[in-house]
Design a protein with these regions (language model features):
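Glycine- and acidic-residue-enriched helix-capping/strand-helix junction motifs
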Residues: 14-28
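Short glycine-rich anion-binding loops that position phosphate/pyrophosphate groups of nucleotides
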Residues: 9-11, 76-79, 102-104
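Extreme N-terminal starter segment of soluble prokaryotic enzymes
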Residues: 1-4
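N-terminal small/polar loop signature for handling phosphorylated ligands or for N-terminal nucleophile
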Residues: 50-73, 77-93
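Short, glycine-/small-residue-rich phosphate/pyrophosphate-handling segment
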Residues: 47, 97, 106-149
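Short, structured coil segments at secondary-structure junctions
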Residues: 41, 92, 118-119
Length: 149
């Protein structure tokens, strides 16, 4: 089983940017956590981060072309603005989980709108970096039941 973990703008600055909201874990540490959890679940996790919307669309399309079984996406600020990401996720029809490190529903009003949620099987918010591991567990369970595809 292969999952694509796609991260949007500023997530490369985890551990630096607003630790009160996002914690002290760096992006490199997050990727290591994901890879360790993937090994326990006997799956391959392809981790990617970009600050550019078109690059994220390209990665979603690559997930389709590479026959990924699932996508975990933290679109960051693009959550609230990107119809392009919504359209890309809808077009590939790969089971997807939206993850946010902070509890976006308790932050500014504009952060409470998610354009991509409509293309996702689940949304996980406010669980810190552990939300990614929860998303991996969810997709493994969903896919092992033969659901989602």
């Amino acid at each position: 089983m292969k999952l694509y973990i796609i991260n949007g703008p500023n997530l490369n600055f985890l551990g630096i940017r607003e630790p009160a909201h996002y914690g002290n874990t760096t992006y490199a540490e997050l990727v290591e956590m994901i890879q360790n959890h993937a090994a326990k679940l006997c799956l391959v996790a392809e981790c990617y981060q970009s600050n550019h919307e078109g690059d994220l669309v390209d990665k979603i399309q690559e997930a389709y072309l590479q026959k990924a079984d699932g996508i975990i996406i933290n679109p960051a600020a693009y959550t609230h603005t990107s119809i392009a990401l919504l359209d890309a996720l809808k077009s590939v029809q790969i089971p997807t989980v939206e993850v946010h490190i902070s509890k976006v529903e308790e932050r500014e009003d504009f952060r409470q709108v998610s354009y991509i949620r409509a293309a996702c099987q689940k949304t996980i918010t406010g669980h810190g970096v552990n939300g990614y591991l929860e998303a991996m567990d969810f997709l493994c369970e969903l896919l092992s039941k033969g659901e989602g595809k």
